[in-house]
Amino acid sequence: MRVDGREKIELRHIHIHTNYLKHPEGSVLIEVGDTKVICSATIEERVPPFMRGEGKGWVTAEYAMIPRATEQRTIRESSKGKVTGRTMEIQRLIGRALRAVVDLEALGERTVWIDCDVIQADGGTRTASITGAYVAMVLAFEKLLQAEKVSKIPVKDYLAATSVGIVEEQGVVLDLNYAEDSKADVDMNVIMTGKGQFVEVQGTGEEATFSRAQLNELLDAAEQGIFQLIDMQKEALGDIVSHIE
């Protein structure tokens, strides 16, 4: 039994609140245990200069954490005048993952801005951001469809992410909270599509190594969790699912 009472291969309690914000074309508040992230999707009727005239769209992301999302207050990165390497890495990860399942040609020459703001952090903020951002993005695409600006919702598949790890006294566990993540021997983030294709796998031994057999076990656990997350995304999207499948 884990510190929060879960089984080893069990997700935290997940809730996806859709249309959480008034102004964005798509928005959600995703809760993964005590981790809470607001994800919004904004449609801009233009593309970056490097893509003009190509007839394709673009998806990009920004990620931030409010000062007291963590146990101790952290200084806003805007106060420092630059984003940290960690933030830049996460932003690129979110954008890259979403682009893997977006039909950029069907989107047309538009930019989708994804904003992920962590309001409470307890591990897995980047994976929660990806899972929530996908739903926010599809909600925004539904607005484009209703306005007859696109002929279909421009996504090719579902997308979700979770963490897995090896914690000494537990072995392989799914969806690590902060307490588990901080003492894990191996920490891994996995992003997959609804068809079971991998988009990204980030795995690191923390002063430890892991075997091929353990890697397979980690990926199996991640796959199980991600398919459950995708079912929750479908439930959150409701009737919009009929435009995707």
Swiss-Prot record:
tRNA-binding recorded as keyword: yes
One GO BP annotation of this record: rRNA catabolic process
CDD domains: RNase_PH_bact (cd11362)
Entry keyword annotation includes Cell membrane: no
Entry binding sites for phosphate: R86, G124, T125, R126
Chain ranges passing through the membrane: none
An example molecular function term from Gene Ontology annotations: 3'-5'-RNA exonuclease activity
Gene3D superfamilies: GHMP Kinase, N-terminal domain
Reactions catalysed: tRNA(n+1) + phosphate = tRNA(n) + a ribonucleoside 5'-diphosphate
Short name of any one Pfam family annotated for the protein: RNase_PH_C
Keywords per UniProt: Nucleotidyltransferase, RNA-binding, rRNA processing, Transferase, tRNA processing, tRNA-binding
Function: Phosphorolytic 3'-5' exoribonuclease that plays an important role in tRNA 3'-end maturation. Removes nucleotide residues following the 3'-CCA terminus of tRNAs; can also add nucleotides to the ends of RNA molecules by using nucleoside diphosphates as substrates, but this may not be physiologically important. Probably plays a role in initiation of 16S rRNA degradation (leading to ribosome degradation) during starvation.
Subunit composition and interactions: Homohexameric ring arranged as a trimer of dimers.
Family designation: Belongs to the RNase PH family.
PANTHER family: EXOSOME COMPLEX COMPONENT, EXOSOME COMPLEX COMPONENT RRP41
Matching HAMAP family: RNase_PH
Protein's name in the database: Ribonuclease PH
Organism: Bacillus cereus (strain B4264)
